[in-house]
């Protein structure tokens, strides 16, 4: 490991700790983890391991977007923590077997995007027209919510919390009222039919939405 790489990683971490006014962070995630497959990869990973060893972070890992990234990274680097997108229509990490694999290997799994940037909880009259190509999916989703007498927010939250392979659910809120609604939601397990699972990246990957 080069001293230059470690010094850079250490400075990034200590600057964050200073801003947050804390002595350590729970998790340090690479948001472009495919950098680990480049020439600097081993040095970078060793630097992450060192900041963990000296007590600046508890766990190190990746924030990833597709199972294919794990296919590449897993044989090379074993993370403590992985964050992935997961929701009622994006079940790629479950269907590929990666959630179960990480659980069996004691890797902590955090999921994000359970509301898919808010799209899954929008009233049907507020859904942007560019999502009309999936009108059949929305019709079935709205009908199912009505039949279950449940809100979309409750369904999305309970679906994610029901998965035994998931340790934490990461949620963003716009205001205190949204936070109160989420905290007051039932945490009872909920099975959402597999028919809602969707493979089209133009829908399930928000980075594609600007092209619609």
Residue ranges and their predicted role:
Residues 1-6, 38-42:
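Short, solvent-exposed loop/turn segments at secondary-structure boundaries
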Residues 4-20, 65-72, 156:
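Short, acidic/polar
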Residues 8, 12, 28, 158-159, ...:
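Generic alpha-helical secondary-structure signal
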Residues 15, 24, 47-51:
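Structural preference for long, well-ordered alpha-helical segments within the folded cores
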Residues 17-36:
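Active-site groove signature of glycoside hydrolases
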Residues 32-204, 208-211:
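Beta/alpha (TIM)-barrel catalytic core signal, keyed to glycine-rich beta->alpha loops juxtaposed to Asp/Glu
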């Amino acid at each position: 490991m080069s001293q230059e790489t470690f010094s850079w990683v250490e400075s990034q971490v200590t600057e964050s700790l200073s801003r947050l006014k804390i002595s350590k962070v729970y998790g340090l995630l690479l948001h472009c983890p495919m950098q680990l497959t480049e020439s600097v990869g081993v040095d970078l990973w060793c630097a992450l391991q060192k900041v963990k060893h000296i007590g600046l972070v508890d766990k190190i890992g990746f924030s990833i977007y597709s199972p294919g990234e794990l296919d590449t990274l897993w044989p090379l680097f074993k993370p403590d923590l992985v964050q992935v997108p997961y929701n009622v229509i994006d079940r790629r990490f479950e269907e590929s077997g990666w959630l179960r694999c990480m659980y069996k290997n004691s890797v902590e799994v955090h999921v994000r995007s359970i509301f898919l940037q808010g799209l899954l909880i929008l009233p049907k009259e507020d859904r942007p027209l560019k999502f009309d190509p999936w009108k059949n999916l929305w019709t079935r989703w709205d009908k199912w919510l009505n039949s279950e007498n449940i809100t979309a927010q409750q369904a999305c939250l309970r679906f994610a919390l029901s998965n035994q392979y998931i340790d934490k659910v990461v949620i963003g809120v716009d205001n205190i009222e949204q936070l109160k609604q989420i905290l007051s939601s039932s945490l009872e397990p909920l099975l959402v039919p597999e028919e809602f699972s969707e493979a089209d990246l133009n829908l399930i990957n928000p980075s594609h939405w600007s092209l619609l």
